[in-house]
């Protein structure tokens, strides 16, 4: 009897999860991974054309959190494809391995402003979203410098 109840409960749980998946060409919330550097990403639309995105990057020299406010727009005749851009900010911490490339710098804190521009696509009929983006940033704390190498490719699972 316990096994039957456990199997029934598991089946109901998986059925509910399947129904919660988004299979349209739009979405409200998505969670996934970003490539270069490696990141966990979550994007949530607060309005049909406005989203908040959080990225937690992990790389050789430390960790960095970036928060972004994105404005999205449709691309005519391309269902599910949107352009986006917006401002943001980051907070990061790097370790002393940074000194291998920058001998005059010690481990420390990284605070700055970011921008983002890119394309976002939601597959109709599947709970999958991909995006490609460029995320230039300017660090203003510790050492002031511009970095144009953030961004890349993201693959997300859409929840709603």
Where are these regions (language model features)?
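Cleavable N-terminal export/targeting peptides
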Residues: 1-25
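Outer-membrane beta-barrel porins/channels
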Residues: 22-24, 135, 140-144, 158-160
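Short, hydrophobic/aromatic-rich segments at coil-to-beta transitions
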Residues: 25-32, 48-53
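Residues that define the transmembrane beta-barrel architecture of outer-membrane proteins
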Residues: 25-27, 34-38, 61-65, 81, ...
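Gram-negative (and chloroplast) outer-membrane scaffold detector with strong preference
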Residues: 44-132
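Short glycine/proline-enriched turns and hinge-like loops at secondary-structure junctions
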Residues: 46, 144-147
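A structural signal for short, well-ordered beta-strand segments
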Residues: 87, 134-136, 153-155
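Outer-membrane beta-barrel "beta-signal"
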Residues: 148-160
């Amino acid at each position: 009897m316990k096994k039957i109840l456990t199997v029934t409960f598991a089946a109901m749980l998986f059925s509910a999860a399947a129904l919660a998946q988004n299979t349209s060409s739009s979405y409200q919330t998505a969670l996934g991974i970003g490539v270069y550097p490696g990141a966990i990403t979550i994007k949530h639309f607060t309005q049909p054309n406005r989203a908040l995105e959080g990225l937690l990057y992990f790389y050789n020299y430390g960790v960095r959190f970036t928060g972004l406010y994105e404005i999205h727009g449709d691309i005519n005749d391309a269902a599910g494809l949107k352009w986006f851009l917006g401002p943001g900010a980051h907070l990061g911490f790097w370790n002393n391995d940074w000194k291998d490339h920058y001998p005059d710098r010690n481990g420390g804190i990284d605070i700055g402003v970011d921008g983002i521009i890119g394309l976002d696509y939601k597959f109709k009929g599947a709970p999958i979203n991909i995006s490609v983006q460029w995320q230039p940033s300017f660090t203003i704390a510790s050492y002031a410098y511009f970095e144009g190498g953030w961004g890349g490719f993201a693959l997300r699972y859409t929840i709603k």
